[in-house]
Amino acid sequence: MSRRLLLINGPNLNLLGTREPHIYGSTTLQDVETQAKTQAKELSASIDTFQANSEGAIVDRIHAARGEIDAIIINAGAYTHTSVAIRDALTGVDIPFVEIHITNVHTREAFRHHSFLCDKAEAVICGLGVFGYTAAIEYAAKHIKLRGKASRL
């Protein structure tokens, strides 16, 4: 059975392509999502995409993934550095996830160096630009060991 993936993008990622293109590049979120769907299909997987600027909406989407999704790819944006709620949601649903960042957060401002998610993630990808999404999707589709209900399929 094909893997069911969920790509979550957090606050301000809806502005990709126009927000600080010298940092984040000119690729739009729609471009990222279109490429993700094409890639997932090529890997015999399916992918749902979701973007929200509010923490609660992200938590709700993670909860809704329980029993339906095999792996999550998440770019939590600024919530990476602040959100215990997103961390708790990810650990609570027991779905393996890959944390992703377009930029190398470790070479940026000090407040971006800490992640509330990384110690629970299967993998962390940062600094590869939007290619990081490609790497994360391939990893999630091919290499993550499934857990819970998904692992019994």
Curated annotation (Swiss-Prot):
Reaction catalyzed: 3-dehydroquinate = 3-dehydroshikimate + H2O
Quaternary structure, from the entry: Homododecamer. Adopts a ring-like structure, composed of an arrangement of two hexameric rings stacked on top of one another.
Pathway membership: Aromatic compound metabolism; 3,4-dihydroxybenzoate biosynthesis; 3,4-dihydroxybenzoate from 3-dehydroquinate: step 1/2
Family: Belongs to the type-II 3-dehydroquinase family.
Residues of the site described as Transition state stabilizer: R19
Pfam families linked to this entry: DHquinase_II (PF01220)
Positions bound to substrate: N75, H81, D88, I102, T103, R112
Matches recorded under InterPro entries: DHquinase_II, DHquinase_II_CS, DHquinase_II_sf
Role description: Is involved in the catabolism of quinate. Allows the utilization of quinate as carbon source via the beta-ketoadipate pathway.
UniProt GO BP: 3,4-dihydroxybenzoate biosynthetic process; quinate catabolic process
Any one GO molecular function term: 3-dehydroquinate dehydratase activity
Residues of the active site: Y24 (proton acceptor), H101 (proton donor)
EC code(s) of this entry: 4.2.1.10
Signal sequence bounds: none
Keywords: Lyase, Quinate metabolism
Keyword Lyase tagged: yes
Keyword Lyase: yes
Name the UniProt record assigns to this protein: Catabolic 3-dehydroquinase 2
